Amino acid sequence: MILKSFLLGNLLSLCMKIINSVVVVGLYYGFLTTFSIGPSYLFLLRARVMEEGTEKEVSATTGFITGQLMMFISIYYAPLHIALGRPHTITVLVLPYLLFHFFWNNHKHFFDYGSTTRNSMRNLSIQCVFLNNLIFQLFNHFILPSSTLARLVNIYMFRCNNKMLFVTSSFIGWLIGHILFMKWVGLVLFWIRQKNSIRSNVLIRSNKYLVSELRNSMARIFSILLFIICVYYLGRIPSPIVTKKLKETSETEERGESEEETDVEIETTSETKGTKQEQEGSTEEDPSFCSEEKEDPDKLDETEEIRVNGKEKLKDKEEFHFWFEKALSTQLFEKKRWNRPLRYIKNDRLENSVRTEMSQYFFSTTCTCGKKIISFTFPPSLSTFWKMIQRNISLCTTEKLSPKDLYNHWVYTNEQKRHNLSNEFRNRMEALDKGSLALDVLEKRIRFCNDENEQECLPKVYDPFLNGPYRGTIKKGYSRPIMDDSIISTEDSTGMVWINRIHGILPNLSDYQEFEDKMDAFNEELVSPDIDHSLNSISELAEESRPSLNLKGLTLLAEQRRLDSENQMKRLKFLFYAVKTDPNDQTIRNKSIGIEEIGKKVPRWSYKLTDDLEEQEAENEEGSTEDPGIRSRKAKRVVIYTYNDQNINTHTSTNTNSDSDQAEEVALIRYSQQSDFRRNLIKGSMRAQRRKTVTWEMFQANVHSPLFLDRIDKTFFFSFDISGMMNPFLRNWMGKDPQFKTSDSEEEEAKEKNKKKKEQKEENERIAISETWDTIIFAQAIRGSMLVTQSIFRKYIILPSLIIAKNLGRMLLFQFPEWYEDLKEWNKEMHVKCTYNGVQLSETEFPKNWLTDGIQIKILFPFCLKPWRGSKLQFHHRDPMKNKVKKENFCFLTVWGMETELPFGSPRKEPSFFEPIFKELEKKMRKVQKKYFRVLKFLKERTKWCLKVSKEKIRWVIKIVLFIKRIMKELAKVNSILLFGLRKGYQPSETGKDSIISNKITHESTIQIRPMGWTNYSLTEKKMKDLADSTTTIKNQIERIKKDKKKIFLTTDINIIPNKTSFDDERSESQKHIWQRSKKRSARLIRKSQYFIKYFIEIIYMDIFLCTINIPRINAQLFLESTKNLIDKYIYNNETNTNKEGIDETNQNKIQFISTIQKSLSILNIRNNNSHIYCDLSFLSQAYVFYKLSQNQEVINKYHLISVLQYHGASPFIKHRIKDCTRGIFDSKSRHKKLPNSRMNEWKNWLKRHYQYNLSQNRWSRLVSKKWRTRVNQRRTIQNKDSKNLDSYEKEKDQFIHYEKENDCAVNSLPSQKEKFKKHYRYDLLSYKYINYEDRKSSYIYVSPLQINGGREIPYNDNTPKPESCYVLGDIAISDYLGEESIMDTGKNPDIKYFKWRILHFFLRKNIDIDTWTDMDTGTNINKNTKNGINDYEKIDKKDLFYFTIHQEIKPPNKKKNFFDWMGMNEEMRYRPISNLESWFFPEFVRLYDTYKMKPWIIPIKLLLLNFHGNENISENKNISENENINGNQKKDLRISSNQKEYLELENRNKEKEQPGQGDIRSDARNQENLESDAQNKKKYVEKDYAESDIKKRRKKRKYKSNKEAELEFFLKRYLLFQLRWDDSLNQRMINNIKVYCLLLRLINPREIAISSIQRGEMRLDVMLIHKDLTLTELIKRGIFIIEPARLSIKRDGQFIMYQTIGISLIHKSKHQTNRECREKKYVDENSFDGSIAQHGKMLVNGDENHYDLLISENILSPRRRRNLRILMCFNSSNENIVDINPIFFNENNVRNSGQFLDEDKCLDTDTNKCIQFKLFLWPNYRLEDLACMNRYWFDTNNGSRFSMSRIYMYPQFRIS
């Protein structure tokens, strides 16, 4: 037993060790390398096959092995690898060598020195064989590419410790493989030589010298193979000719044009081997902002020199290099592959092209948390620099610390830091206790200012010190006034600066004071010493060698874009002078640098390339004509129309001819549909970098690599489409079986599909043919000339000769000739020359470059030879649907002179000349036949009649004879009976007996046989017939006997047997018959019953199904009708506006409801009779339907819907979300009760379930303080109890506007310090609520000033009337759906993927009169409102779109519910955005939600669907709400013209802390008064540039009227994508029209052609009805012109991180508690800490903004120091009780991820303890965004995707055991 386990265990471990050992892996890799066959094998085999002697064989093998050994050594030795692996090595070595070798083989006498008698090793040929094999082994292989193996090596070399052992073992493995391979080759060759069958082959025997010839020509065969290899390599190498150097963007130009530059990736897929060392060398980051250095090695050397020595030096070193050395090294081994990369892949329109050779991941060891770990995002530059230092510093000075010492040191330093911070914090707190002023104790923030008195500071938004390190980016695109207010710059400084690298990485802390003193100031004044703040953090991080540190990011300089005016800056720069570290005070460079966040600098190419399209755009605008650098798709420019006008020549005489020519041509671009894999490649770049691809199809969507052949579905040899073959069989089988019978509609659909497939197939074939003509050289010229020849031949030779022949024939047959008609038809035929695509030009005009681009010849009214004219006239009056045949009265000419309906289509069948003749002959023959057959028919009928009569007569005679015979028989019988009747009367006669017996037998037999017949149907027809015959004969006999008896036994005494009377017999017989019949029928019924049942069930099922389908339709119809009626009723009530008591509204509603149901039912019935039901279900959302149901208590109490809601399966009609929620309404406990009408009813409880952490999504995304919040606070505090009248409203409005103006200044663009303070206060309070969660019993973070669950309103004054919605729903979270703000805020939302262009609208609706969005109706225009003077339909001015309707009278709410005020959501509805729209409405409409925000819940969804397609005058009824009774004359509209709004967008988009271009309506509201007057002036330029589209102007450079116009142009271009949708509006009919127009324009008298083309239906009149000046508005309305927003990249900053982290927070039951009284009680009941919070909460509600409690003591410290303290507290958490509470929870195995948490039951009371622990563990004593910082500085994670990883899994590592 022991032996067994010992053996088994050891064997396994031994096997594992052997398999994982370096030697085995090396052997395996070496063996694999054997199969990587390259050109060297060719020479090795040549030496064997040619039998040139053993010396040559040995030298070949030796050279081969030596070459392979060199390759293996190159794996280990990086310089050799780099030399051999570069593609340019192939350029230099391979091609000349191959060519030389090729010629050497062909012309041996040039190099043949003759055989020498000396030592064979000195023989030149043997040496050459050795060299060949050696050198060829170094080249790239091409059967198994070495790059695949190289990647394997790279992976293993990174893991492997003993690299030399690996190289050796891999070489040995290769050697073994090679020996085996060569042995196998030798055996094969030996077998071929020895095999007799090959020699005795008939072919070889017939030519006895063939074998010797083959042997002699072997050298020639090898040289041919060598030539093939040459060609193969030629395709892979970069061109050795020096290509044009790309135009580099200079530093200033690059910075200037950066706004429009294109951010691209460069795909480099060279097949070189990259080792780790190569990566280290090549992936070094670009040290400067401008990547130009990498372009030129000279420059690189120079800058390195400058950086290392810290001074500016002369270029001394350069003199030591010879010029050709530099040039050669650059040409051959430059990393950038000479001039250019391979491919551009466009991403964005912001920056230069990214260089993707720079690896995103760089592995290196780093010291983190006192332990050495591998960091995968280590800066490569830091690594190389550290290696340089290590080389230069002697080894004795560096001592290696043990891991334990490192860890202890880390712990100690952390403790020290924490101790120092805590002491400082304590000191500050003590000072506060002693009564010091709070402002003195508070740690002050460092400001960035340009004078000592801090009078001129930067605005807070732009201050890099105030905004935190990860938010300190400089915003782009400032307008002039803001910039002037914020800072004054005298010159436009655009220099480059280098920071001393050594100083940055190894800072000397003692020099800090000196370092600060030596910094020069911005604008030649001292910068505040506080600049130390940012540099301090840099040095600390450098000291701790944080892996994610990247000092080169410091040299990033803000870019700027120069527009027409020279002085306008697009960017604000924060500049200060460079660092001085030289003792002589000489600056490194006296230029400015910009500080930006420390991050990875993306290396970029120093030039940008454009493609043809961009070049065309640039040409149109600026007239620049640079050659495009990127290859575009294959295309041909086809000129379809040239505009020749005398007047233009006079106007454009000043211009050059080429310009005017260009402007006057209208051309189409025809793209080739062929696979074009050169597309997007950079012209002149290396093709060697492309992967090996094979293109085997005519049209191949993607490039296929042979590597993935096995993945491709269809192989070449057997591509059997089994499913395709099965389909027809299945279809036939299903058609026959009655169970699988398909309906007619399905069959039609299938036919339609097949037809479409066929058409598609034909079209593909046509395209294939056209592309084939395009690809073959000179094919177009040949085809064109053939077409022209065929055209002439047809028109002038074939057709005239046919006409002559026909008419001569007619004359010979004595008929009138038709010369005139035929010649008229012949003249009518026109041969129109067309472009290759089929655009018609004219009969005489050929398309431009038709010999190269191709030509089509279209035949209009093709001549058709007919034997006589006028024969086809009858077809005109047929069914109009069949006229389609007549319509196509044209064709295209093929190369062979045939006719085809479409270019390159299959030739159509031409009508035969003789067919009508044969038809006519047939008709005549039929007439003759008809007459002949009539005669025959008559004769036939006569003969038939004669036969019939004779037959009848014969039959009659026979009958008479038979009758006589029967009478005679009967008489004989009667005689016998009369003689013996009295004696034998009582006995039954013999025949009677027999018959009875036989009858019994037959009955029995039939009874036995029948069941057998029922069960199986196997009785033959014959048997059945016999049986039937026998029964009938028996029946006849019985009847006859009965009759005889009746006749004979007339006397009573003869009746001896009393029961056998004749009547009884008859009755029994009839009963028997009935019984038998019933038996038969029941049996048949039983047999067929199952089919009846089945059929019956199916009918019932179908009926039920149809009923259920109709239910939602009927319901929807009812609600539609009721909605309309109730709106009408309510409007009527408002109009009358009297105080009379009407009917009780609820009853009225009920009556109205019932009447509408009846009415709509009748309508439905009528519709059912006439046509199918049609209801627009999109009118109402399901939520609204359920709401209406909940209001109607009778419906609920009857529980009609309970079964639907309780059904747990997939309900076909109700969305799951709504179904789940609605179950709350129909609670089964309250089954027999009426629904309570109390304030907290079930409906409201149900609504409470809809929350997003009880904050709307908008709220989470924007928890930072915004201007609107402060503004609304101020607005609220103005109001008092009597503020419902007009005056207070006016006052409020004025103050509101005044406040906005005040806030608009650039200096005060941030909220005041108090507001800032309040913001931090709220944050900290929120975090403290989390921390102290376990002390509070069940309360959630109710009391925080954010008012998360309490007053979700903004803090109000006690006197302020709160919005009605708070009362209506018992304070439930309406804000989950509607944002809190009253002015619509379209600020940053993390869910927005698009730039919200809907809010721009600018000139889009230019000519549409849209009634205000405040007017609402479900679709009817009610004009009676105008009677009472209520201006319901206030039209927006032609240019005005956005304005707000501010109501001046807000009446207290009435108690009765309004129809449309459901859920109380109409309070201030037009201002509230819907943040969670997707939860109830269909997600398709979410994109339109900006417009919808203004009037949510009431706008019929139909209007959203028909956004631009509605009527030109959309008018809607006024929003009528019980909460707001508004008189129209008291409305004031703050209107903003759309262009003005656009201008505002440009002015203000940089003020907001969001992406550039994300506009905000509030900015418009702020500036509306100032800009009201400019509206008319500003709209002109927009119209001018966009409303008109003029071909001639497009080519000229556009002169901007103003900078604003240019800015607008730039803005539109950059953030919006404009595209035309051609498929719909510019459809085939339109294109057909255009083709006809092209022809008509060229004709002198186009009338006839025009009329005929209209008759043929080729030119459609309805399409012709186009406005002369199509405005942009109409194009948009029709859906032709589409404006899409460019996708924005959202900056995932602190708010978003907070949103993400809170997303996994756990849900608690008590969260649903919403009663304010309960909450206030809770404030008092909690401990003192919560009490103070309650005070604070109440203080906020009281609106006392001047008083703040310093509740959160940490506010004394600055945020950065606060963060440091908290992080240190967290990691030295031994003092806290967090871990001690529940150590089990902190077991690493027990830590669950967020998914597990969310999968648990929603009610987490069962897991409360662990929840608390999780929260404490997740939220230690630091703010939410500190998590991001911790990730950045402690866990080396910069990426958000790894954020959750650290949050959930990494914390337990730091627990104190």
UniProtKB/Swiss-Prot annotation:
Coiled coil: none annotated. Residues 246-255 have a biased composition (Basic and acidic residues). Involved in protein precursor import into chloroplasts. May be part of an intermediate translocation complex acting as a protein-conducting channel at the inner envelope. It comes from the Eukaryota. This is Protein TIC 214. Belongs to the TIC214 family. Part of the Tic complex. Its main location: plastid. It holds the Pfam family Ycf1. Keywords: Chloroplast, Membrane, Plastid, Plastid inner membrane, Protein transport, Transmembrane, Transmembrane helix, Transport. It is a multi-pass membrane protein. One of its GO terms (cellular component) is chloroplast inner membrane. The chain crosses the membrane at residues 18-38, 64-84, 87-107, 124-144, 172-192, 221-241. GO terms for biological process: protein transport. It is found in: Plastid, Chloroplast inner membrane. Residues 246-304, 612-631, 740-764, 1547-1579 are annotated as: Disordered. Residues 256-268, 281-304, 612-625 have a biased composition (Acidic residues).
